[in-house]
Structures are given as C-alpha cells and as structure tokens.
C-alpha cells in the first residue's frame, strides 16, 4: 500500500482554501456580460477559448494533492449545477467560494463547524423559498429569447434562434446543437416523428430529383421481425392494394423474395409502397416501434403478443397524413393516433426519464419524447474558424439549457439582483435562530448572496461594494446592467435569470461549502519521486 500524507485542522483547511481559491479565480473571471475568456491548452489541436464556467472548472487539476481536493470539491459544485439546470456554473462557483471563505474565518475564530453548517442549510432553505415566491412564469416568446440572449453572453441572434426553436417544437420537443459547414448559424426543424432509417431500395423513390419517397394519406405496417418470404406477407398486401392507399412498411428487415416483390411492383407501376428498417436496437427498437404504433393509431404486429403477419388486417395498420422517406431517414407527419393514447405514452416516458439513473438512457428517452410530442429542432452553429465555432457552440448549449430551466420554474431579475432581493427575508429570519453559531452560519449565506453581483461589477471594472449598496437601495426588480453601466428594471430590460438556475447554484454551492467547513483531515498519497535519468554515454549520438 502506498504511503499517505495526512494534514489536520488548520493546516488542512488552509490547503482546501488555497485549492478553492485557485479554481474560483480561474472560473469567476467569466461571469457577467463583461466577463473575460479563458484559453485552455489541449493535448492535440488548437487551444479552446471559452466563457463557460463548468468547461473551465473541468480543466483545473492542481499539482499539490491536498489543494487539489479543495479544487475538485468546487468542481463538483459546477458539475452538479450543470447537471441540474444546465447553466449557472460560474455563479455556483462564486457562491461556494464566498460561503467557504467566510465560513472558514468563523471556524478559525472558534465557531462550531457543525452548527455553522446547520445555519447555512436553514438559510439556504429560506432563500430558496423566497426565490420560488418572486419568480414569474415565462409567458411570451420575447421572454424566452431574452433568457437565451443573456445566457449566450448577450448574443441576440442565438437568443432568437432558441426562442424560435422552442416555439416550433414545444416544451417536450428536442433541440440539438451541431456544427455547421458554413459561416451562418441556422435552425432546421423536423416536424413529426423522424428516425434515421432510409428506404431499402432506391426504386421506392417517387421524386427522382430529390430521391425521396413521398406517400400521402398512407397506411403504416409495423412488424417486429424480419420479412423474407412473400407467403405470409401477401394477404395484407392484397388488402392494401384494394384500398388504393400507399403503404409504409417498418420491420426489423425486409429481404429476399419479399423485397424483390415490392421492387417489381414499383417498377411495373403498381400501388405505391416503401419499406424501411425499424429504428434502434434490442429493447429500444421494440419501444420505438410501439411509439410509432401509438402515433399512427395502429398496432405493433408481434408474435410475442400472439399476432402473426399472415393474420394482419387493415384495421391493424397505422395511418399518417404524410410520410417522407429519403436515403437516410424517415419522417411521419401527422400520425392519426388518438390524443389520449399519445398523451399517456408521453407521460409514461417522462416517468421513465425521472426514474432513470443513466445519462445515456435519459438522453434516448428524451429523444423519444420529443419525436412523439412535437418534433426535433437542430441549431447548426457556423463560424469563420474552428476555435470560434467551439466557443459559440458552448454558448448555444448554455442558452438552450437556461431556456429549458426558465420554462420549468420561471424567471427572475438577472445580474445577481434576485439574490440581493432575498437578503431582507433572510435578515428577518435571523432572530428566529436561537443557537449563536447557527445564526453566524445564516449570516455567512447572507453575506454570500451579494458575491455574484459584486463579481459581475468587478469584471465590468467597477467597485462591487458600491454597486451592491446602490442595488440594495433600489426597488424590487431594479438592478445593475453591467453591459450598459446603468441601473434599470431588469425584467423590462430583458436581463433575466431562470429561477431553477439560481436555486440550483445556491443549493449546490452551500452543500459542498458546508462539507468543506466540517472537514478536519485530508489524506493523500505521497507522490513518488522519479529516479533521475542515467547520464548519456560518452560520445553518444556523435558522428565519426
């Protein structure tokens, strides 16, 4: 077992403080509209330029193992806030440093760390309740655009694109961010159910120019096994041909005699048909086929459910207003399924998302929900250079998450103003605490609430304490607009923060800072000293 280096009490806390401060100094310069960029060296390719707090935090690794523990704990604050709300990572880091620094001063002066932590936790609960009270729901397209614009570092183009995407795909829709090939940042919206499986033969294409197969008022056959022979398949094909409507076939695979028959039918000008493979794999494939069945009002023909392809009838087939199939993907527009069944399916998927512990599973479930309930929007980010594109893509990601958070829990006056407006409520709560050290813990939170505003002011080249006093003396929604160096009504000016982001930042910061304050010992491995390299042989590497 490797020997360990152990630090105790004051020495341990000083090491943690140095690690916390080092990480926080790198992260907090990015806060606010006049925050600076951080350039991160990469082992390959060009350096990364970012203003995203969690991206900066993730890159920090300190040489001193004890100091690194403090840095890693604050890194956890940024990561947890990003996981919960998708934004607010820099605010969370600033709050964590403020709570820990002030808390450490009081512990050194003799306060009981456990009582301090209890006081911090009680104060955070009071502030969170107040945040919920003062938040207001997002009601307009304009407010969504404003939240996204602020989170994208005051880029109105990104803000408007995200608001447009949210409007088109709805609350449950999926917005994905990709890199564009050109300079322009554009929005593509795919309405209806879309999956990445194209037609099995180009003979199915109905439009030779676009190489797409477009089926209007189509029937949809959904089968979970391979179709190779024609015998079992023929009865349902004959019924469809008699109905005169086009047919989309979705199955695990269609091959051999079955595929050949369908292709020959198309070449001879028979009824319009298109065959595609089922999306996904394993259990996910079955779930997606069930989704398609509910969306189109059909049934999944599955032998597991006692259904055979040879017994399939028109009543079992789904219906869609339009189906568009290209070489790469299939889109089902306006499926004719019952709204009640569709809503129940969406609720079931939402429950699975809540219960899932895997990020990958959550992402796939979210995709399914989006496809069922509204559609998928793709924002393609363009820029002149790869470095600029990556930086812009980070900002689009932040803005997207902030917007989703705003829709979930409402909005607050931004620029750190909302936390300032919670100070009077917390001051009124202090006399209710009978334990002196708990009261000190609550005062630590009280002081920390002004830290984000002061940092925004400092990054704008102003004196934080003066700006704080000015904001404190003003009415509810009035705050400091660092971009324009003016005091204004933050809601009217469109400087908004999602309530979920502010709440998550404070909760994560207080949680980790409280743990650090109650730490009395640090244990780390003693780094091994590498033996010095052997001296070079005389004359080595010389030509004679």
Curated annotation (Swiss-Prot):
Name the UniProt record assigns to this protein: Chaperonin GroEL
Single biological process term from Gene Ontology: protein refolding
SUPFAM superfamilies named among the record's database cross-references: GroEL apical domain-like, GroEL equatorial domain-like, GroEL-intermediate domain like
Chemical reaction(s) catalysed: ATP + H2O + a folded polypeptide = ADP + phosphate + an unfolded polypeptide
UniProt keyword list: ATP-binding, Chaperone, Cytoplasm, Isomerase, Nucleotide-binding, Stress response
GO molecular function per UniProt: ATP binding; ATP-dependent protein folding chaperone; isomerase activity; unfolded protein binding
Gene: groEL
Chain residues that bind ATP: 30-33, 51, 87-91, 415, 481-483, 497
Main function: Together with its co-chaperonin GroES, plays an essential role in assisting protein folding. The GroEL-GroES system forms a nano-cage that allows encapsulation of the non-native substrate proteins and provides a physical environment optimized to promote and accelerate protein folding.
Entry-linked InterPro entries: Chaperonin_Cpn60_CS, Cpn60/GroEL, Cpn60/GroEL/TCP-1, GroEL-like_apical_dom_sf, GROEL-like_equatorial_sf, TCP-1-like_intermed_sf
Cross-referenced PANTHER family: 60 KDA HEAT SHOCK PROTEIN, MITOCHONDRIAL (PTHR45633)
Record's keyword annotation contains Cytoplasm: yes
Intracellular or extracellular location(s): Cytoplasm
Family, similarity comment: Belongs to the chaperonin (HSP60) family.
Gene Ontology terms: cellular component: cytoplasm
Description of what induces expression: By stress.
Entry-linked NCBIfam families: GroEL, PRK00013.1, PRK12849.1, PRK12850.1, PRK12851.1
Record note on quaternary structure: Forms a cylinder of 14 subunits composed of two heptameric rings stacked back-to-back. Interacts with the co-chaperonin GroES.
EC id: 5.6.1.7
Record lineage: Bacteria, Pseudomonadati, Chlamydiota, Chlamydiia, Chlamydiales
